[in-house]
């Protein structure tokens, strides 16, 4: 199925951003081989030259390395991958803050809203960990 593109930015830049998201999320793990230009172009529904341009941009940024006869591989540079994840998360958070401020929310209200949304997951995780601890503790008591 072809990737979705919009008319607001050049397609090759949209491809770069999609591939960066896939790298940051681990869909393309560090050191993994990327599909060929032709295969990626078919998957995305774009001209191979457009895909080549996007991949060249990723090579220039250091996220992808080209090995002459073996293909292209995702970098294993942990710092580069952390920088990518941080810059992408910073951009997402900045956009979120701008949208929430646009709704008239103060920074304090934004922080509280985010805390409320994160808290249920944290509480659920703590409950799960406590349940596991209790089960292990009970098993240990039964053995003694």
Range-by-range predicted roles:
Residues 33-44, 58:
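A short alpha-helical element within helix-turn-helix/winged-helix DNA-binding domains
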Residues 41-42, 77-78, 119:
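Short Asp/Glu-rich motifs
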Residues 1-33, 39, 87, 91, ...:
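Extreme N-terminal segment that seeds HTH/winged-HTH DNA-binding domains in transcriptional regulators
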Residues 75-90, 94:
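A surface-exposed regulatory interaction patch that couples sensing to output
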Residues 27-28, 57, 62-63:
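Short hinge/loop at the helix->beta-strand junction immediately C-terminal to the helix-turn-helix recognition helix
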Residues 34, 66-74, 78:
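Short, Lys/Arg-rich nucleic-acid/phosphate-binding segment
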């Amino acid at each position: 199925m072809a990737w979705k593109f919009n008319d607001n930015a050049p397609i090759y830049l949209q491809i770069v951003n999609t591939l960066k998201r896939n790298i940051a999320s681990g869909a393309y793990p560090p050191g993994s081989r990327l599909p060929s230009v032709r295969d990626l172009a078919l998957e995305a529904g774009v001209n191979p030259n457009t895909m080549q341009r996007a991949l060249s941009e990723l090579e220039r940024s250091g996220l992808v390395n080209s090995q002459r006869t073996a293909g292209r591989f995702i970098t294993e540079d942990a710092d580069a991958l952390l920088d990518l994840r941080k810059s992408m998360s910073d951009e997402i958070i900045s956009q979120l803050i701008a949208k929430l401020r646009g709704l008239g929310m103060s920074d304090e209200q934004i922080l509280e809203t985010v805390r409320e949304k994160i808290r249920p997951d944290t509480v659920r995780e703590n409950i799960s960990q406590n349940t596991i601890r209790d089960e292990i503790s009970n098993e240990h008591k039964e053995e003694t």
